[in-house]
Amino acid sequence: MLFRSVFEHLFREYGLPKRIRSDNGIPFASAHALHGLSRLAVWWLRLGIEIERIKPGNPQQNGRHERMHRVLKQATARPPAGNMLQQQDKFESFIQEYNYERPHEGIQMKTPAALYEPSKRIYKGLPELQYPFHDRTVVITECGRICLDRRKISVSTVLGGQKVGIKQVDDQIWQVSFMQYDLGYFDMDSCRIEPGPNPFGPRLLTM
């Protein structure tokens, strides 16, 4: 995943954020996956980053980011440069001016660079997953299934290769958890997961 290598570079240089707010599109979310998770979102969760989704069709909930994109497009792509090298020069000039030179009204006429502090959370790769309060720890297959007692329970391909905890809560009924998040339940007869309440669903956000 190209975007993963880009984020790894950013996390090594600037540290890990507490949370990342995004819309519900690719690669941040997957409409057809369990709870809208994507492989990128799963990786963020593994790193201890909270995922915060805006409500669909409400870009104003991420207004600062949307405005930055408008300013970026206006300054660098209207009109675009004649070639890739010239376009990159325009991007770098924009970054210098936007972050280090131009004062912003929203931050008392200071520059973003004057206020920015890197995260103190150091990127160290993925921590090991453990489920001491579950009956079993199983690894989701790359095709998105739990293999249990010769049965194959479909969960989600975005969790392929990840360890999950399963706990029997009733006769033939098992709860599935990923990290501290309860994903849903499956029974041994249907071999299909029934999603629980979405722990990553959009909610009312403030800027």
Ranges and model annotations:
Residues M1-S93, E97:
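RNase H-like DDE/DDD metal-dependent nuclease/strand-transfer catalytic core used by mobile genetic elements
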Residues N99-M207:
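C-terminal, beta-rich DNA-binding module of retroviral/retroelements integrases
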